[in-house]
Design a protein with these regions (language model features):
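Glycine-rich loops and low-complexity Gly/Arg-rich segments
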Residues: 117, 127-129, 162-164, 172-173
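Cys/His-rich zinc-coordinating "finger/knuckle" motifs
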Residues: 145, 150, 166, 170
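Short, glycine/charged-enriched secondary-structure capping and boundary segments
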Residues: 152-154, 174
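Contiguous alpha-helical segments
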Residues: 167, 171-179
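Cysteine-rich micro-motifs
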Residues: 154-164
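Small/flexible residues
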Residues: 138, 158-159, 175-178
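Short helix-coil boundary/hinge micro-motifs
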Residues: 1-149
Length: 179
């Protein structure tokens, strides 16, 4: 484990959220998709289950995506802004069978606020440990998805959308064509 469990979960969730704003189709087209995302990433707390909530979660994606695209100083600016705007107050909590971990918003805060702050708190750990190079963009041509590399040797190059398999098949075909 590179980071604490809650940090890794928040990083993976942030990347998954960013990747729902894909170039080809909307990954959160409706409230059902948001509900599925909420459950898949273990989110807890208040939900409005309305279009305004969906819009606010979608609006968070470009701000988070910038973190994968900029240098450390600008990452710090984005993270600090997310924490400041949400009046984040870090506290140790234990719930749903999880050991103590940090939350910086109350469980009744709006979902997009909780997502923003959880991501920001995770990025704090990434910056503090000098591990920003673990945040990458998928190397597969024309993909553009973001990647959180939690491998021990920082070797993850592709996103979770099958790009690694496509790259391996392309390399295999190229080798076969040369022989």
């Amino acid at each position: 484990m590179i980071f604490a469990h809650d940090t890794e979960a928040a990083l993976v969730s942030a990347a998954a959220l960013v990747n729902t704003g894909g170039r080809d189709e909307e990954g959160l087209p409706n409230l059902i998709a948001l509900d599925q995302f909420f459950r898949a990433h273990g989110w807890t707390g208040r939900r409005e289950h309305d279009e305004a909530e969906l819009r606010s979660v979608r609006a968070l994606r470009p701000r988070l995506r910038r973190i994968w695209e900029v240098g450390e100083d600008e990452v710090v600016e984005i993270v600090n802004a997310l924490l400041r705007e949400s009046n984040a107050l870090p506290q140790l909590v234990s719930h749903d069978g999880w050991p103590y971990h940090l939350h910086a918003t109350p469980p009744d805060a709006p979902l997009a606020t909780r997502m923003a702050v959880e991501a920001a708190m995770a990025f704090v750990d990434v910056v503090r440990t000098g591990e920003l190079r673990r945040l990458r963009v998928c190397e597969y041509p024309n993909c553009g998805n973001v990647v959180v590399d939690l491998s021990k040797n920082r070797s993850k190059r592709f996103c979770e959308a099958g790009c690694g398999n496509r790259a391996a098949v392309s390399a295999y075909r190229a080798r076969r064509a040369q022989s």
